[in-house]
Regions:
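Acidic-and-aromatic substrate-binding clefts and catalytic sites of carbohydrate-active enzymes
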Residues: 17-23, 39-54, 118-120, 155-162, ...
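Active-site acidic/histidine proton-transfer and metal-coordination neighborhood
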Residues: 2-3, 81-183
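N-terminal pre-domain/capping segments
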Residues: 1-99, 103, 141, 179-181, ...
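A cross-domain feature marking catalytic cores of carbohydrate-active enzymes
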Residues: 13-17, 42-44, 67-71, 112-114, ...
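A short small-residue
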Residues: 74-79, 109-116, 228-229, 267-269
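Histidine-acidic metal/acid-base catalytic patches
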Residues: 1-12, 21-30, 36, 106-108, ...
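Low-complexity, flexible helical/coil segments
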Residues: 45-52, 74-84, 97-106, 145-150, ...
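Short amphipathic alpha-helices and their capping/turn segments at secondary-structure boundaries
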Residues: 46-65, 94-104, 130-141, 197-210, ...
Length: 298
């Protein structure tokens, strides 16, 4: 593509994935100083002082601020589709808190994921997830904010209720019947974990997608970094590299997601593995993005 990728997408990264060992303020400062990034995804802050420092940096940066509530659920093992109503309410409460924190930091919405499920109670879990998501969307709507559900694997690692893509489409359609501030977040690194292609996922979920992530996964059992670990592009025995990202970009172009007037956020969901250097891994991702974009036909 002769046009810059920044014309059609707000390129972001997930702060806590890119810099898992950094002090969060140092990390935000470093990313805010990098003009490759148009967006940043942040999560829950440990205290008011740190949150205030982050807000000050973000306000100066001209970065689009996005808020990922996934760690709020994964860390304490809260489940928004918990069939136990008390458990479900706890998950809902932290997502409501996330809306408030996101608003304070300048984000226009939050993203989260579904929880674990059992085959025998899948329909009940689905109903519970609808209840949670509707309540959170109703609260967010009062603030003019959106709520995005990230599609995950259903049997490999996170084993979340939502995907695969057709099931995510059903859920999104049900949500849109009542809440127009709901959308889906899709992640290239999750496609191999749901045994799906970029074309299938994007075409299946097209009306509901509001946000993109890119990354990699190892789906060969017994291999290092197996599951939903988000290793760098080109990691040994992994599923995604330049060609797969090029295919992803091609599908987004064909399906009408190149939007210069109101660009979608497209964020790196890539994490250093073991003792890998975070800055080299970020540079690796940028190189792969630049190469795949350069190969994309106008």
């Amino acid at each position: 593509m002769r046009d810059s990728i920044h014309k059609y997408f707000q390129i972001g990264t997930i702060q806590w994935m890119s810099h898992p060992t950094y002090d969060v303020i140092d990390s935000i400062y470093k990313l805010a100083c990098d003009d490759f990034f148009d967006a940043i995804e942040i999560t829950k802050f440990k205290d008011d002082e740190t949150r205030d420092q982050a807000k000050k940096l973000l306000k100066q940066s001209h970065l689009k601020v996005c808020y990922g509530a996934q760690p709020r659920l994964l860390g304490p093992k809260l489940n928004p589709n918990d069939i136990d109503e008390e458990g479900r309410k706890k998950a809902e409460a932290t997502l409501i808190e996330a809306i408030d924190e996101a608003e304070y930091l300048g984000a226009k919405g939050i993203a989260f994921l579904a929880g674990k499920w059992e085959k025998e109670t899948k329909d009940l879990a689905y109903a519970q997830l609808l209840k949670t998501t509707r309540n959170v969307c109703d609260y967010a709507a009062k603030k003019g904010m959106i709520v995005e559900l990230e599609v995950f694997d259903y049997d490999m690692d996170k084993a979340a209720l939502i995907g695969p893509a057709p099931y995510a489409a059903k859920f999104a359609a049900d949500m849109r019947m009542t809440n127009d501030n709901f959308g889906l977040m899709v992640d290239l690194s999750h496609f191999p974990t749901t045994y799906e292609s970029s074309k299938f996922v994007i075409q299946t979920l097209r009306p509901y997608i509001t946000h993109f992530h890119i990354g990699n996964a190892v789906v060969k059992e017994g291999c290092e970094a197996y599951g939903d670990q988000h290793p760098r592009f080109g990691f040994e025995n992994s599923a995604n590299d330049t060609n797969e990202l090029l295919d992803f970009f091609s599908v987004l172009k064909e399906e009408g997601f190149f939007n210069a007037k109101n660009p979608y956020v497209l964020s790196f969901e890539v994490k250093p593995w073991g003792d890998e250097d975070p800055e080299i891994i970020l540079a690796n991702t940028k190189r792969v993005v630049k190469r795949a974009w350069a190969l994309l036909e106008d």
